[in-house]
A protein has these predicted regions:
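Glycine- (often His-adjacent) and acidic-residue-rich active-site loop
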Residues: 35, 43-80, 96, 208
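Short C-terminal tail/terminal secondary-structure segment
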Residues: 241-247
Length: 247
């Protein structure tokens, strides 16, 4: 399991162009190395996961530059995480605001420490979320609550995030990474091809794709042709643990 740490603690791990480019490089490497089965995304230091974008970069932007910034981030990082065929889980260790909340939401699911805080405060800058926040927050917490959080720019704590379904677990700070790692250890011992299909099909469901059920039927059928499916059935009938190879 790879651990990816956003490491700008002096800037509360804010996302700037350099961080986006570095994340893109790391994700590319993660995709290409079959021995890396899953990844944890977290922030350095005790205070912050990612406290938004680097606002100092905003002053020079116009409409074209703003749209280009959002498009590049979406393509190189946020959509790349969401559509990763291998699980990427966020371990939110502190502030996850603006682009930080969006980064956590792009992950397949999220765990948070008791100190974590979430919010989309872009409205306070006369802006809106630009890295998928309007879409993913709505998918995760529902239209009404997403509207309220984005319109007020309010921050919520970890227990509220848990209640809303924004995070799956809340742990004491020192248990956050061990708990995330333990969940991933369970997942990486399952069949990798099935996990990839679960990610792809669940993402289709989240965007309300009309062909989701047909895609599921097709994928269900395809998996019967895999060595892993044969191994899974044999192991079950022989009452032994399955050993999946991703084939």
């Amino acid at each position: 399991v790879l651990t990816i740490t956003i490491n700008r603690p002096d800037k509360l791990n804010a996302l700037n162009k350099t961080v986006i480019e570095e994340l893109h490089t790391v994700l590319d490497s993660f995709y290409k190395h079959p021995e890396m089965k899953a990844a944890i995304l977290t922030g350095a230091g005790p205070k912050s996961f990612v406290a938004g974008a680097d606002i100092s970069e905003f002053l020079e932007l116009d409409a074209t530059g703003g749209a280009a910034l959002a498009a590049k981030g979406q393509e190189q990082v946020f959509s790349k995480i969401e559509n990763s065929p291998k699980p990427i889980i966020a371990a939110v260790n502190g502030f996850a605001l603006g682009g930080g909340c969006e980064l956590a939401m792009a992950c397949h699911f999220r765990l948070a420490s008791e100190q974590a805080k979430f919010g989309q405060p872009e409205v306070n800058l006369g802006l809106i979320p630009g890295y998928g926040g309007t879409q993913r927050l709505t998918q995760l917490v529902g239209k009404g609550k997403a509207m309220e959080l984005m319109m007020t720019g309010a921050m919520i704590n970890a227990s509220e995030a848990l209640q809303l379904g924004l995070v799956n677990y809340v742990t004491p700070a020192e248990e956050l990474l061990p708990k995330t790692n333990s969940l991933l250890q369970t997942i990486i011992h399952k069949a990798p091809l099935a996990i990839s299909e679960i990610i792809r099909l669940t993402n289709l469901a989240a965007i309300g794709a009309e062909n989701g059920l047909q895609e599921e039927i097709n994928a269900f059928g395809r998996l019967f042709d895999t060595a892993d499916a044969k191994e899974g059935a044999s192991a079950f009938l022989e009452k032994r643990p399955a050993v999946f190879k991703g084939k």
